[in-house]
Amino acid sequence: MDVLSAVLLALLLIGANAFFVGAEFALISARRDRLEALAEQGKATAVTVIRAGEQLPAMLTGAQLGVTVSSILLGRVGEPAVVKLLQLSFGLSGVPPALLHTLSLAIVVALHVLLGEMVPKNIALAGPERTAMLLVPPYLVYVRLARPFIAFYNNCANAILRLVGVQPKDELDIAVSTAELSEMIAESLSEGLLDHEEHTRLTRALRIRTRLVADVAVPLVNIRAVQVSAVGSGPTIGGVEQALAQTGYSRFPVVDRGGRFIGYLHIKDVLTLGDNPQTVIDLAVVRPLPRVPQSLPLADALSRMRRINSHLALVTADNGSVVGMVALEDVVEDLVGTMRDGTHR
């Protein structure tokens, strides 16, 4: 083989190595949510990449096979070609062979590492979806041609993995962390896929796992309660009407003569009892008031209050003492934002 043909073949092998490295890193790094969004926009190559990602072991085996073969052939062809090129172009025929071969090998390794490995890898990491959509379609042609070899090496690798107790996976784990979801939501806002209200709502929904009951609880000093009229009886209709006029709320905790919480009343429970302010409300009408620890995550508090169908709950400290109260509305508002109505204050 003449020098020019050998040099061109070496450059072709470096390009092939770069192709396989780029395809491999693009497949691993491409985010499925972005690819699905591109597919919905009519990008057929995005669908191709998604399907390729569902056969990840075969795709990666093919890339490794291509990289390995390209590297071996480059070493076989490239180093002798560079030796001849140096001898002819720079008049180094008198240089000791050992030094000349060492210099040639260093040049080939540098070109291989820079152009065949680092550059394509960083291009793929900088724009994985774009790179995957560019490289995967022709890469799949190679995979079809090399399928017997890929299947053989893939089966051998899976057998070895099972021997050491590792279960092979057919595709990447697509589970993402809260931080990654937050990043996706922020990117969707910047790209115009979400408006500000949707962005706020989704951000609040993610935050609910880190928010505690203590973050939305109303302190005891700010609670408007109604007191029973006498031991063993409930509050009066007049007392409830007064609390309603002062606050506009529809639910009020009930306390005994000692200030201890015994339940809560909904205003609709009182409407059917007449309009005499002196009428004493039967304690049977008073609804139970559950307790939730202040350290309980809001998501768990929401589930618990919905399960027992309670709109109010006492908030307790670690020692069991009551430190405040939380309303189901407060928990929901922390998730979706403030909901205003005619009585909101």
Swiss-Prot record:
It is found in: Cell membrane. GO terms for cellular component: plasma membrane. Keywords: Cell membrane, Membrane, Repeat, Transmembrane, Transmembrane helix. Residues 1-198 form the CNNM transmembrane domain. Pfam families: CBS, CNNM. SUPFAM superfamilies: CBS-domain pair (SSF54631). Belongs to the TerC family. This is Uncharacterized protein Rv1841c.
